[in-house]
Amino acid sequence: MPKTLTEKLNAIKAAGKGIFVPYIMAGDHEKGLDGLGETIHFLEDLGVSAIEVGIPFSDPVADGPVIEEAGLRSLAHGTSTQALVETLKTIETEIPLVIMTYFNPLFQYGVENFVKDLADTAVKGLIIPDLPHEHANFVEPFLADTDIALIPLVSLTTGIERQKELIEGAEGFVYAVAINGVTGKSGNYRADLDKHLAQLHQVADIPVLTGFGVSSQADLERFNAVSDGVIVGSKIVKALHQGEPIQDFIKQAVAYQK
């Protein structure tokens, strides 16, 4: 039986709507982790498809400056993986949450304990950007009997046979990395990006979402046209931190019709 995240996103896709997943950094709030539920419910009320929740880490190799600084602010507020897990247990939401964490915090906590402790929460997906596919066996056995999907990240420079290998048996969605580089680096797109996304669609039987560098209305339109939806991180994180209005951008993303 498909996992909840797969079913939820497939239903949005089947309805002819674009999938929209904002990223937030846990603990990057004036109230620290006490403000996490407030942010999640703010986004839920705007109708987002799912929410990616980042765990702060001192060496975030895939993150650009906006998210790296958010992580440092979160750590300064005293955020820990243990405290985040305890906070997630208290948050009630109908929106699937997807945890984005580097492997080190997960390893320090204990993969099996982490998965068990999140079993009764809204967490339905897990992204580990620095975990090679060849080492997925460090995590996958603990997820097998849970409702948490391990999300594959696929570079659009990856050949089709490798793409098939990366997404075989995957649930939730495929995270298509739109740029070569770190998050938030807008506009540095390959000339053949659309062709690579079309190729990825041919081999994926779950939704394909585009992320890394998606930050403008033009980006939303472009990537919704060639993938099943988008993930937006740096723009959301910056707006929430600086108190900038972000509602209209999110509403436009949520309302996108295929």
Curated annotation (Swiss-Prot):
The active site is at E52, D63. Keywords: Amino-acid biosynthesis, Aromatic amino acid biosynthesis, Lyase, Tryptophan biosynthesis. Tetramer of two alpha and two beta chains. GO terms for molecular function: tryptophan synthase activity. It comes from Streptococcus pneumoniae (strain JJA). Belongs to the TrpA family. PANTHER family: TRYPTOPHAN SYNTHASE ALPHA CHAIN, CHLOROPLASTIC (PTHR43406:SF1), TRYPTOPHAN SYNTHASE, ALPHA CHAIN (PTHR43406). This is Tryptophan synthase alpha chain. It comes from the Bacteria. The keyword Oxidoreductase does not apply. PROSITE patterns: TRP_SYNTHASE_ALPHA (PS00167). It catalyses: (1S,2R)-1-C-(indol-3-yl)glycerol 3-phosphate + L-serine = D-glyceraldehyde 3-phosphate + L-tryptophan + H2O. GO terms for cellular component: cytosol. Signal peptide: none annotated. InterPro entries: Aldolase_TIM, RibuloseP-bd_barrel, Trp_synthase_alpha_AS, Trp_synthase_suA. Its EC number is 4.2.1.20. Transmembrane segments: none annotated. The alpha subunit is responsible for the aldol cleavage of indoleglycerol phosphate to indole and glyceraldehyde 3-phosphate. Pathway: Amino-acid biosynthesis; L-tryptophan biosynthesis; L-tryptophan from chorismate: step 5/5.
